[in-house]
């Protein structure tokens, strides 16, 4: 593996080569440019401005770190911000799985059966009469035999799949909402490398559940799905054959695999995506909308776009990345005598 210093040196070399090519092209095209004003977004001046801005954010309480679920690219091995997403159509298949309740089986449909060991609840819409009698009861998961509550939440879609869904930590952003708002436990089984973690989780105790998990452990999500689907078919807890479908999935703009949601420690800037009360007693999101109302937008429709953008934020701005090349966050962490890094003891 290449060292951080050598990697950055190579990046700078490539940057200089690209700059020369772009300048030659733009001169050839006759663009009117003041060549004394060029800069690099990760140059010394830009870094100084960005780092000073971050320290101001930190001082004002606008920047914070958190161990939280976030979008993760398993290929690039880095966290990804909402602004870097691309929605692309992705092939998949619905798998009908039978959860076992006292009054009979409850069938759900999922495109992510490999996340079954991470399931923490079954969730349906509170107005869905098909499942209202189940709210407050429990079921056990197929093959893993884990007891799970059946809960109600308005984000459940009655017309999607079977109308009742398993909440896993985490398959998509809706799972994050359910986990946070319903106070559900964290049961992570997918690592940052995109593979099922090797150690069997403590919440899986049955003999057949342990065997099924060990058959998945260490595999990629795709291979783990294949192994578990075979096991579910053998146990009779997958009903029928998988039904091909396509879904919109989130991709990193530079990636070729759907993003996963992985829990990691990252730095964030408050932007209204999460609840936060400001000094005037109002939510940050409300203050951002109010500030937009004081501006004159040209053209007018950009005001609507701004309001939609603020209203559509579902998380704060994630600014840290697991990359060598970029603007470093100007912080250090103390190291305990044991050699363990204390991320809560920040040195500015």
Where are these regions (language model features)?
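Residue patterns forming the tRNA-binding/recognition surfaces of aminoacyl-tRNA synthetases
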Residues: 1-105, 160-339, 343
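Protease-associated
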Residues: 101-164, 172-177
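Short, intrinsically disordered, charge-balanced linker/junction segments flanking boundaries
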Residues: 344-348
């Amino acid at each position: 593996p290449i060292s951080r210093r050598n990697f950055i040196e190579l990046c700078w070399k490539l940057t200089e080569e690209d700059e020369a090519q772009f300048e030659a092209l733009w001169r050839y095209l006759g663009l009117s440019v003041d060549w004394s004003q060029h800069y690099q977004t990760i140059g010394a001046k830009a870094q100084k401005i960005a780092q000073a801005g971050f320290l101001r954010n930190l001082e004002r309480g606008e920047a914070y770190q958190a161990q939280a679920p976030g979008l993760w690219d398993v290929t690039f091995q880095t966290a990804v911000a909402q602004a870097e997403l691309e929605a692309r159509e992705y092939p998949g298949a619905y798998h009908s799985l039978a959860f076992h309740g006292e009054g009979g089986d409850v069938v759900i449909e999922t495109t992510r059966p490999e996340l079954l060991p991470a399931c923490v609840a079954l969730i349906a819409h509170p107005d869905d009469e098909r499942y209202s009698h189940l709210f407050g009861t429990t079921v056990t998961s197929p093959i893993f035999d884990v007891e799970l509550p059946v809960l109600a939440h308005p984000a459940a879609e009655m017309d999607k799949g079977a109308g009742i869904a398993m909440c896993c930590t985490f398959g998509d952003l809706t799972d994050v909402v359910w986990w946070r708002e319903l106070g559900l436990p964290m049961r992570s089984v997918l690592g940052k490398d995109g593979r099922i973690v090797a150690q069997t989780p403590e919440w899986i105790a049955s003999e057949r559940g342990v065997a099924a998990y060990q058959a998945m452990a260490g595999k990629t999500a795709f291979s783990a799905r294949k192994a578990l689907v075979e096991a579910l078919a053998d146990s009779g807890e997958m009903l029928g054959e998988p039904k091909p479908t396509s879904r919109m999935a989130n991709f990193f703009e530079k990636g070729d695999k759907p993003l996963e949601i992985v829990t990691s420690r990252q730095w964030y800037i408050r932007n209204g995506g999460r609840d936060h009360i400001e000094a005037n007693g109002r939510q940050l999101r409300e203050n951002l909308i109010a500030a937009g109302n004081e501006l004159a937008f040209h053209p007018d429709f950009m005001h609507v776009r701004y309001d939609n953008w603020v209203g559509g934020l579902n998380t704060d701005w994630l600014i840290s990345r697991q990359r060598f090349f970029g603007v470093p966050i100007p912080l250090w962490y103390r190291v305990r005598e044991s050699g363990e890094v204390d991320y809560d003891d920040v040195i500015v």
